[in-house]
Amino acid sequence: MAQTHSFNGRKRVRKFFGKIPEVAEMPNLIEVQKASYDQFLMVEEPSGGRPDEGLQAVFKSVFPIQDFSGASMLEFVRYEFDPPKFDVDECRQRDLTYSAPLKVTLRLIVFDIDEDTGAKSIKDIKEQDVYMGDMPLMTDNGTFIVNGTERVIVSQMHRSPGVFFDHDKGKTHSSGKLLFAARVIPYRGSWLDIEFDSKDIVYARIDRRRKLPATTLLMALGMDGEEILSTFYKTVTYTRDGDNWRIPYSAERFKGMKIISDLVDADTGEVVLEAGKKLTARAAKQLAEKGLKAIKATEDDLFGSYLAEDVVNYATGEIYLEAGDEIDEKVLKTLIDTGETEINVLDIDHVNIGAYIRNTLAVDKNESRQEALFDIYRVMRPGEPPTMDSAEAMFHSLFFDSERYDLSAVGRVKMNMRLDLDAEDTVRVLRKEDILAVVKMLVELRDGRGEIDDIDNLGNRRVRSVGELMENQYRVGLLRMERAIKERMSSIEIDTVMPQDLINAKPAAAAVREFFGSSQLSQFMDQTNPLSEITHKRRLSALGPGGLTRERAGFEVRDVHPTHYGRICPIETPEGPNIGLINSLATFARVNKYGFIESPYRKVVDGKVTNDVVYLSAMEEAKHSVAQVNVELDEQGGFVDEFVICRHAGEVMMAPRENVDLMDVSPKQLVSVAAALIPFLENDDANRALMGSNMQRQAVPLVRAEAPFVGTGMEPIVARDSGAAIAARRGGIVDQVDATRIVIRATEELDPSKSGVDIYRLQKFQRSNQSTCINQRPLVRVGDRIHKGDIIADGPSTDLGDLALGRNVLVAFMPWNGYNYEDSILLSEKIVSDDVFTSIHIEEFEVAARDTKLGPEEITRDIPNVSEEALKNLDEAGIVYIGAEVHPGDILVGKITPKGESPMTPEEKLLRAIFGEKASDVRDTSMRMPPGTYGTVVEVRVFNRHGVEKDERAMAIEREEIERLAKDRDDEQAILDRNVYGRLVDMIDGKVAAAGPKGFKKGTTITRELMTEYPRSQWWQFAVEDEKLQGELEALRSQYDDSKKLLEARFMDKVEKVQRGDEMPPGVMKMVKVFVAVKRKIQPGDKMAGRHGNKGVVSRILPVEDMPFLEDGTHADIVLNPLGVPSRMNVGQILETHLGWACAGMGKKIGELLDVYRKTANIEPLRQTLEHIYPDNDRNEPVRSYDDDAILMLANQVKRGVSIATPVFDGAVEADINAMLTDAGLATSGQSTLYDGRTGEPFDRQVTMGYIYMLKLHHLVDDKIHARSIGPYSLVTQQPLGGKAQFGGQRFGEMEVWALEAYGAAYTLQEMLTVKSDDVAGRTKVYEAIVRGDDTFEAGIPESFNVLVKEMRSLGLNVELDDTREAEQPALPDAAE
């Protein structure tokens, strides 16, 4: 045993079953959010040298702003942020937004314009810092605090800018003909569509308006007919040769053609190929090699072809024929008459090259650029008369003006790639060449060359993260502001103003506020547990502004695409209308600078797999062959098999090993975080895995978290990256620990400018967004040595730094008296009594005292007509005590509101006269506990408006807070003193003194003992002869003084914030928040689930003695129905049960060996067993090098059950499970004989029994159960409201009415439709009747009938009720009978 490893017991040790080594580090799971927003704000960058992206780019794109006359200009210089006013916790408590003030330096330049020459000269330059509103900051965990609540900005998937080619799949035209179309999508600006119609004419549309012939667009670009044709077609020259014509021969043009008439050499007259034969490519090439230069053509060959250029009489300028005209006899005669000996025709054969553009030109009525521009102008702005200037300006602004049109760097890169162009990615507008290239490519597609694009390919979809969404929003705000600035610059005397006077930052600030407050992508963070937080931050939504809508999204967009592999999880997506539109990022994926999702791959060089990792987007990956991660490799990293399964361009195929150039990094890389937490995922059906990954996000944090026996190795990563467990920022020694904070004296990364002390505040019983409880517990003890990144405190749902969403429970798979029919769950009472599935929920109640028209509301204990009993929990200020147990209807905060004056009765006057004023002019509006909620008050916060006198309770809370701050300051000061004075002693111990405190002899050697005789404050008076050392001493002293000052200043600042009044909404004088904690034990009706999508509702809680038990008397905790497994195909739960059983068996064995050690002090058997469990490899803990103390600590940790990790797609196989069961001394069948707890008889068959990890989900029966007595009614229909929140009733719908009709239950039906619902008079009568003890009543007219009548009257149909009874109607005459 060469080197001993100490094991500190602060982390969970897992036995790893994975066989594939991890090559790449998994990126931080919330990097997506943090990197994006950092790139937008660029706080760290020096303000002078920021690159043009993010906020800098927005300012650069809007500024400089010139006024309308050009006499002045406002330029942007730089921006910077002041430190935020309040820190994250203060913002949470005070309902504020965590943000930093944005200061922008602007420069106003005023010009002198010479009236004669128009020359400009600078007259004046002014610079000024302008406050431009607050910019929200991101917390360390990738969230935003907006008005006191944590929000997440979800990343959006949208179609990447660029050009896309597609066809209608034959749906438009009845013949099923494919109509091709191209679309140029910019990042912002007008869309350009170019499409074929059923007659093969090419049309262009701008912004989905009316279509125009594509040639109109080309003419507007400055081309004429001849130029258009010469761009799209080659020409063939027919030369007059006696009576015949000759055309040049080219092998390219003639290959593959069937020869209709003999092919005759024009020079020799010999027939080189007879009619009816096919000219193969080889034969065509041979003819050229033999020297065939030209062939004969007849006039018939000319007919049907098109002229390539205009035929003009240059003397008169008369145009005889135009380019594109079809040649017929008449045209040919004209040509021969004009004496043409050469005719250039377009090379169109209607097979490989169609005449689409020529036909479009023929259809197009526009002849010139002006007509084309006018035509476009009319389409874009119907009803306005065009002029050349306005039409030209409008056309230019559509695609060629960088203010209005932006392809973005991504769009330009995509366009260059698709069209083989080479424009710089700074060219963000369209060019003439781009439009021509698009039309050319479209025509080629129609001719059968090339492929259309797949818009669901991840190469054509990109991610917009927080930074980019925010950038777009801020640009909108600045543009609104720009208009106002321009107007103000023109209307004001510009010489006398400063930049501050021109700027009104409200629109910019409003745009930011609007985005964070009400954008569809700014969501209330799902904070149920750490996993739900992380998943929310990694979510990708195709919905939102500029995205899809649920109704319009078809099946294709939602479906899994081959390019999702390693980028988007194919499993985790919601069930229901959003399926496939909301996705989750895969574990190893990251987003590149262009917004495309990249996945990591290992490079394969010369058939050997290297550890060199490259990240590739879907576009780049398409060119490679990628091998799976579980391919068999030899020692040198070469492929064992001749042929390897690999993916290439979306297809899975067998490829020779020489062709493989990449390999996956990890088997986890194709799934998301939540799916990677499911052990044996490979054995579950995908539908159930989807439910499993979604339900883990709904698991409620339990009072005692317990990590799963059977994990996947992802647990510590999630706990760390979510920020639930606290990791040490730098190494050091623990100095102090209590439940609320940990103080660590740093020993690594010591920086003179920073404090040498790290204080970690722990969150205690805080309420999360979902009312679950956030509570952190320290894991360290005083004196522990900590390394950077060690977990020092556990949070909600974490256990020793591992994610722990549920509990390990002993499960038996068997039916039990029908109590687990249809996925019901039978539980043991022991689970309730041991608080296994108990959770704490914290509800927040808020009450505000406002200033009303009749006078201010008052928070007080003095409430009219309330018994002393009801006030027993309130203090003298009328606010409930902390620790009070409250029940439904109890008063939490007493509040009275002034009542309107009403005329007094004589009795009231008398009472007033006797007892003084205050009798009845206030009413009780106290805050009471809602029905069905019980709990304990855990926290009270009181907020007062500036200048409002604070009550006793507010003062007490304030004093407590200041004491806590003072304690923090004193502790930090004490550690600082200890550090600094310790260093001082080390520096001067044994040195010769040059001076010292009073009474000290110069020249004496300083020793530690000597120094202790003087008080610490005098130690600074020692001076040494060594000048260099003396300089260091002085530096230490000044640093110490600075640190002290900083500490005091920080303390004073915080105290000032505590004492200052709070910002309140208008009209609110005082606000009280009461937090009530509720302990929820598990009960029938609660929903539970495993990790494999096996969910159910608790049906009964059985006494322990009735539960089935094993031979040794161990009772099952939970009984599940075995029929829930086969049809659902989530066999993973059975494998987990077996492996969990083996884990517990091994744990029991270790417990027994621990007892042996305690009796005999022989540790060897224990050591050998642990070394057998954790074999020596790079994935397992180095147990062989543990010392005895570490072995005992480990044994104590695993005696309840050995934790193991079985990573997805690389986990334990059947043989591993069997081996582990055998090691634990259990049957390899995984089944045991069970005995019936009620009779003690054994069951007939052996039963599968083992440990399974069960979660309690956030669907608690307490939150759902609800019964209405008399409650609120809807104003219009007078029917009871619906839903628990409104204390509503149960809807009696159309179908329920049919049921009563079918039974003939006429009276019940009448009651349902009248007195129990909306017959206003009737229901009061019923109440009165019941009170009298009389049970007769009459139904009247339902209010909804009156609503119907009113609606009909609004349509002009008068409906009146006829009140006459049938009895009064006259009898009909006999004839009518």
Curated annotation (Swiss-Prot):
<dbReference type="GO" id="GO:0003899">
    <property type="term" value="F:DNA-directed RNA polymerase activity"/>
</dbReference>
<comment type="similarity">
    <text>Belongs to the RNA polymerase beta chain family.</text>
</comment>
<dbReference type="GO" id="GO:0032549">
    <property type="term" value="F:ribonucleoside binding"/>
</dbReference>
<keyword id="KW-0240">DNA-directed RNA polymerase</keyword>
<dbReference type="InterPro" id="IPR037034">
    <property type="entry name" value="RNA_pol_Rpb2_2_sf"/>
</dbReference>
<dbReference type="InterPro" id="IPR007642">
    <property type="entry name" value="RNA_pol_Rpb2_2"/>
</dbReference>
<dbReference type="InterPro" id="IPR007645">
    <property type="entry name" value="RNA_pol_Rpb2_3"/>
</dbReference>
<dbReference type="InterPro" id="IPR014724">
    <property type="entry name" value="RNA_pol_RPB2_OB-fold"/>
</dbReference>
<dbReference type="InterPro" id="IPR019462">
    <property type="entry name" value="DNA-dir_RNA_pol_bsu_external_1"/>
</dbReference>
<dbReference type="GO" id="GO:0000428">
    <property type="term" value="C:DNA-directed RNA polymerase complex"/>
</dbReference>
<comment type="subunit">
    <text>The RNAP catalytic core consists of 2 alpha, 1 beta, 1 beta' and 1 omega subunit. When a sigma factor is associated with the core the holoenzyme is formed, which can initiate transcription.</text>
</comment>
<dbReference type="Pfam" id="PF00562">
    <property type="entry name" value="RNA_pol_Rpb2_6"/>
</dbReference>
<dbReference type="InterPro" id="IPR010243">
    <property type="entry name" value="RNA_pol_bsu_bac"/>
</dbReference>
<dbReference type="Pfam" id="PF04561">
    <property type="entry name" value="RNA_pol_Rpb2_2"/>
</dbReference>
<dbReference type="InterPro" id="IPR007641">
    <property type="entry name" value="RNA_pol_Rpb2_7"/>
</dbReference>
<protein>
    <recommendedName>
        <fullName>DNA-directed RNA polymerase subunit beta</fullName>
        <ecNumber>2.7.7.6</ecNumber>
    </recommendedName>
</protein>
<dbReference type="Pfam" id="PF04560">
    <property type="entry name" value="RNA_pol_Rpb2_7"/>
</dbReference>
<dbReference type="InterPro" id="IPR007121">
    <property type="entry name" value="RNA_pol_bsu_CS"/>
</dbReference>
<dbReference type="Pfam" id="PF10385">
    <property type="entry name" value="RNA_pol_Rpb2_45"/>
</dbReference>
<dbReference type="InterPro" id="IPR042107">
    <property type="entry name" value="DNA-dir_RNA_pol_bsu_ext_1_sf"/>
</dbReference>
<dbReference type="InterPro" id="IPR007644">
    <property type="entry name" value="RNA_pol_bsu_protrusion"/>
</dbReference>
<comment type="function">
    <text>DNA-dependent RNA polymerase catalyzes the transcription of DNA into RNA using the four ribonucleoside triphosphates as substrates.</text>
</comment>
<dbReference type="InterPro" id="IPR015712">
    <property type="entry name" value="DNA-dir_RNA_pol_su2"/>
</dbReference>
<keyword id="KW-0804">Transcription</keyword>
<dbReference type="GO" id="GO:0003677">
    <property type="term" value="F:DNA binding"/>
</dbReference>
<keyword id="KW-0548">Nucleotidyltransferase</keyword>
<dbReference type="Pfam" id="PF04565">
    <property type="entry name" value="RNA_pol_Rpb2_3"/>
</dbReference>
<dbReference type="Pfam" id="PF04563">
    <property type="entry name" value="RNA_pol_Rpb2_1"/>
</dbReference>
<dbReference type="InterPro" id="IPR007120">
    <property type="entry name" value="DNA-dir_RNAP_su2_dom"/>
</dbReference>
<dbReference type="InterPro" id="IPR037033">
    <property type="entry name" value="DNA-dir_RNAP_su2_hyb_sf"/>
</dbReference>
<dbReference type="GO" id="GO:0006351">
    <property type="term" value="P:DNA-templated transcription"/>
</dbReference>
<keyword id="KW-0808">Transferase</keyword>
